[in-house]
From Swiss-Prot:
Signal sequence, renumbered to the chain: none
Catalytic activity: adenine + H2O + H(+) = hypoxanthine + NH4(+)
Origin species: Rhizobium etli (strain ATCC 51251 / DSM 11541 / JCM 21823 / NBRC 15573 / CFN 42)
Cofactor note: Binds 1 zinc ion per subunit.
InterPro entries to which the protein is assigned, alphabetical: A_deaminase_dom, ADE, Ado/ade_deaminase, Metal_Hydrolase
Entry keywords, A to Z: Hydrolase, Metal-binding, Nucleotide metabolism, Zinc
A Pfam match: A_deaminase
GO terms classed as biological process: adenine catabolic process; hypoxanthine salvage; nucleotide metabolic process
Residues the record lists as binding substrate: D271
Protein name: Adenine deaminase
Protein EC: 3.5.4.2
Amino acid sequence: MTSHLKKVELHCHLEGAASPALTEAQARKYGIDISGQLRDGVYIWHDFASFLECYDKVSEVYRTEEDYALLTETYLDELAGINTIYSELIVSPDHGKRIGLGADAYISGVCEGIRRAKAKSGIEARLIVTGERHFGPESVIGAAEYAAKAGNPLITGFNLAGEERMGRVADYIRAFDIARDAGLGLTIHAGEVCGAFSVADALDAVRPARIGHGVRAIEDLDLVKRLADLGTVLEVCPGSNIALRVYPDFASHPLRRLKEAGVRVTISSDDPPFFHTSLEREYALAAEAFGFGDAEIDAMTRVAIEAAFVDEETRKALLARL
């Protein structure tokens, strides 16, 4: 129903986009046992904490610059095949350090994958460097400093992800100040595992242009109005929210209510194979589960381009492709 529509994705974690087939091949290549995390082509986890553990274990099978080029190229090729014109990938240089590859080689591999994919299909992509809450404020500050000093034109944003229940946003203000001063776009995970207060905290402390998820703002109607008045863009990932039991079903999900309240919303897939989804499915759900028509879905895609962390020339070119 939505296969003909142009698509844009603002919220996808790179390692979280790794297909089970590619991960299995990588595990065989390195002789790594991931049977506790991947069985019969399905990633195995049971709650948010175990999902993060599964994610980290799966990430261990991607070890070299070429591994990351392949992972990135494979996902962007998949996106291009469903009419996607732009993707922002959330990446963690800290992961490159932890596996002994190093942040520079990790990012270099990802950038090579972006170049390969663009050469084939014309898909544009940018990188959002993220700090992980569960590694603590100093680690997050390090990620911000890396992004700020990298001087890489493909690194255009900074994010805070990970275990949302660890610390308040105020603990990470310095990291966002570093990123802001470097001219990076700011987005932050909030209003997913934690309630509306986490969205308010993010607005108060960080003043981000965008919020990853943010859907639980619906629990505070004054906050919803504030989001609408500010023009803050929500990177909404309905399939992820259902998989993580933020909401029991799509009928309960507030995507439509947020949009009708004037909040600027977009559609993304988060960690697609972990949540049995894809960007293609998320767009189809917008039509089938939420009842949006083509024009409404195109409007959300336009919002995503308007909110993308890109230079104005690229933004104009993307808007012209809609």
